Amino acid sequence: MEQADSVTFYGVAMDGRQGISLDNFSVRGSSGLHLRSIPLHTLCDFQRLRPYDLIVVQYGLNVATERGVKYDGYKKGMLSVIEHLKTAFPETSILLVSVGDREYKNENGDLRTMPGVKNLIRYQQSIAADSHIAFWNMYEAMGGQGSIVDMIGQKMANLDYTHINFKGGKHLAGILFETLMYGKEQYERRKAYEEE
């Protein structure tokens, strides 16, 4: 029997055979670029053992900065991440979810949406378009400019003016679910129309 010096675990699955299964590969503070470092053969094993219908990629909030204008390096890296995932999961749909609102205090001490957030979202839209994957703008779903402040007022976000909490996540998940179901309904209508 061979012994290894170390072992890397990506998770343990204890799902039933019915219903929806959700795997979450979260890394706090990650830009998402770490996904490139998962060996392709490991991802292909995931595909073989746990074939996914949908992969949701939602990273990047800590990439946004107060003065962030260009995120070309991030875009290049994320394009390679998406390509890596598409290679391992060729039959799986991929959805890129944008960053949400993030506030900072301007020179007058007023809370404002960090300028880098809007710029990063434009880059994320471009990543999705260039990769031919779906895109969902969480910033707009939150309410756009200054929305994290409103969510804090509704106890749906943390006082760091950056991160939503469980209640906020549940709220946004409901909006995303409705969006996905609407898209599915429209797809089925179009498909039925084309088959007539």
What are these regions (language model features)?
Residues D23, L95, A134-W136:
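Hydrophobic/aromatic beta-strand patches that form the interior of the parallel beta-sheet core
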Residues V57, L95-S98:
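Short, conserved beta-strand edge motifs with alternating hydrophobic and charged residues
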Residues F89-I94:
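A short helix->loop->beta-strand "cap" motif at the edges of active sites that frequently abuts
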